[in-house]
Amino acid sequence: LSHVLIIDSDAVVFTPDYLSTYWEMRHVADVVCGSIQSPTVCPYGCELRYKYEEAARNVRQMVYREAHPYAHLSTFNILFHRDVFDQTQFDERCTEYGYEDALMGLMLEKLGLTVEHIDNPLIHDGMDPNAVYLQKVETALRTLHHLGEPMHSASPLVRLVRRIKRWHITPLCRLAYRLTRPLLYRQLMSHNPSMTCLKCYKLGFYLMLDKK
């Protein structure tokens, strides 16, 4: 067995040449990363996850992924050389949802292993209901808080939290979150959730974790 192909349980193969594309590209790098495509129609009640995935489309463009091969690695759809997979594995600290992909990217970069991004998509068919997805977001933030370095330095959210601390406005931001959390929650549970509200919710939630 020379290679290990990882496909997420929520992924759907929809192109006839999916496997042959990976086979032809298997020697171009230590790790070959395919792409993710959202469903064409948003399932009712799953607008939050759907809009998040749509907003993430820009960083999933091939030109961006090629420019940042480690930062936007995704194990949703990925081919490892067997020796590389045995050498890296997944971080054992990630026992819950979130950040295993980011940590894998950091590990591959640290080891000097090569990553090639290709246009070989799978459809992400696991659109969670709004409340379920927000619970996953909270779990991922707890995971991030627990991980420490080097993940913290690589996280835009943690870097923002550090700036807030330097500006000495952390108590004010926590108060704003406590006051607006019910409104943010209702907005995120609506059929037209705002990604700006999601960012504010994540920042406030993380600041409260940091308080503990």
Predicted region positions:
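Short beta-strand-to-loop acidic/aromatic patch adjacent to the donor-nucleotide binding site
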Residues: 2-12
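Conserved donor NDP-sugar-binding/catalytic core segment of glycosyltransferases
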Residues: 12-47
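Short, flexible, basic/aromatic active-site loop/helix in glycosyltransferases
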Residues: 51-70
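Glycine/small-residue-rich pyrophosphate-binding loop that anchors the diphosphate of NDP-sugar donors
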Residues: 69-78, 100
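Conserved nucleotide-sugar donor-binding
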Residues: 74-88
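Acidic donor-binding loop at a coil-to-helix junction in glycosyltransferase catalytic cores
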Residues: 96-104
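Active-site donor/metal-binding and catalytic loop motifs
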Residues: 111-136, 140-148
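Non-catalytic, C-terminal membrane-associated alpha-helical segments of glycosyltransferases
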Residues: 139, 156-212
